Amino acid sequence: MKILFPRKKHLHFIHIGKTAGTALKNALSDYTDSRHAQIYLHGHDFKLTDVPDNQYCFFSIRDPLDRFVSAFYSRQRQGKPRYNSKWSAAEELAFSLFETPNQLANDLYSDNWKKRVNAEYAMLSIRHINNSYWDWFIDERYFLSRKKSIVFIFDQTSLNSDFEEFKKLFSISKKALLPNRNSVNAHSNNVSFNTKLNKVAELNLKRWYAKEYVFIELVKKTF
């Protein structure tokens, strides 16, 4: 998704968890200084509020349901093989209660209060699942006040074509390539994982992540 060509060269990556950020950072790590941009590849703690007013940023988005499934399996395997990020005590309990993302999502609004409470606990305890796009962009008013700072938005569903467009826009070397989906550097889930959600799970997640869809629609409407 092309936005604007910046006059300034300082370009900051806002890394939202489980939106293909690791793959993008890996692809750009050797090409952060191009003719049109000096790129800064930040960690998850860097937000829109950290971008200086006279500088620019880019980030990637992903459907909240897909992001949920990806986050579940990523944390279930503790980030391996690329990382080895141990569970928190809360995550350990959550994964003792739920083996699949579909099981967790199904119980979110269960009539059985024990299932519902356990599901809510897991949703609030598992890293990436328990954060929001708004954690990085504050609120709609602030996001819109900084829209001129946002020069490119990747969509996980069109990542390859978006990346080619990004390279052309900022004169980044053609040698910069996204890692193969199954490589460690991509930090993606094993294709053998059961990523399917049934209808109840989908409806529950759309209800739970209602504010996330507000953000996605705001991005599409604004850019």
PLM features: what roles do these ranges have?
Residues 1-223:
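Membrane-interface amphipathic segments in extracytoplasmic regions
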